[in-house]
Amino acid sequence: MRIKKLLTTMVLSVSMVMALTACGSGAKETDSSAEEKKVLKVGMECMNAPYNWSQTDDSNGAVKISGSDEYVNGYDVMIAKKIAEENGYELEISKIEWDGLIMAVQSDNINAIIAGMSATDERKESVDFSSNYYEATHVVIVRSDNAFADAKTLDDLAGCSATSQQGTTMYDSSIDQIKDVDKLEALPDIPSLIVAVDSGRVDVGIVEKPMALAAIATNPDLKMIEFEDGKGFDVDEGITSIAVAVKKGNSDILNACNKTLDAMTKEEKDELMEKAISIQPATDSE
């Protein structure tokens, strides 16, 4: 009888140990899986077509904006999705005003800026940049019936009124190259700039070529002026180089971005940009 009780006790003890071991193993697996979960937290304006814009549904591959009922789509979103998918990251996109993007990545609220941002020397003092994911020349948008609509060189714009988006190289540098320019106050975003030009409040707006193509595609009264080499804006290569910005020293995200971007051809990037322009909404929803 004593032996039977002893055997029963031993069996129960072994069962408990096995159960505890299994629970411990499950907890470790759960912890390990949580540790392995990687999230690419991207910041962008969500109102800078064709790079990025907000919309009300997930059509054409749009991504839900974190903390919002809206979705975001555009060239930047396509690039972000490609980087995330090819490097095993979940993608999370936050809507952040342009002037707050660098601060957001520095404070770890996001870990990447994919927002049509050019890799200028000044910005390189604050963040690290990936390889380029687009080359964007500076061009002019103007109403077709404006006095400066037939400009062929920068000199032909002499005396015009001009503006661009605040905090951009177009406003800080390119506009000043126009002789006798009436430089108006910078505008907060591209939709505001398009409205200003279309309404005649300003003669010309200086933007990157993709944004100009997007603007004229949805605003029939506007035209784009792209000057021939040597006849337009003198812009450093770094200013036209669009890249992903990350917090200084964040080599994991930077290497992941470069792995994907370095493998992309110019043709692939151009195709994505053409797709973004073709699916953009008539107006950004703000």
Task: Map each language-model feature to its residues.
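C-terminal motif of bacterial Sec signal peptides marking the signal peptidase cleavage site
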Residues: 18-22
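A ligand-binding cleft/hinge motif common to bilobed small-molecule-binding domains
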Residues: 100, 116-126, 173-176, 203-238
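Extracytoplasmic small-molecule ligand-binding "clamshell" domains
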Residues: 34-117
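Flexible hinge/capping segments at coil-to-helix
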Residues: 31-32, 60-62, 144-161
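Acidic, polar ligand-binding/catalytic clefts
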Residues: 85, 90-156, 235-237
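Ligand-binding clefts/hinges and TM-proximal coupling segments of bilobed small-molecule sensing domains
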Residues: 25-29, 169-185, 224, 256-286
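Short helix-initiation/N-cap motifs at beta->coil->alpha
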Residues: 75, 92-105, 149, 184-199, ...
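Periplasmic-binding protein-like
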Residues: 135-142, 218-261, 279-286
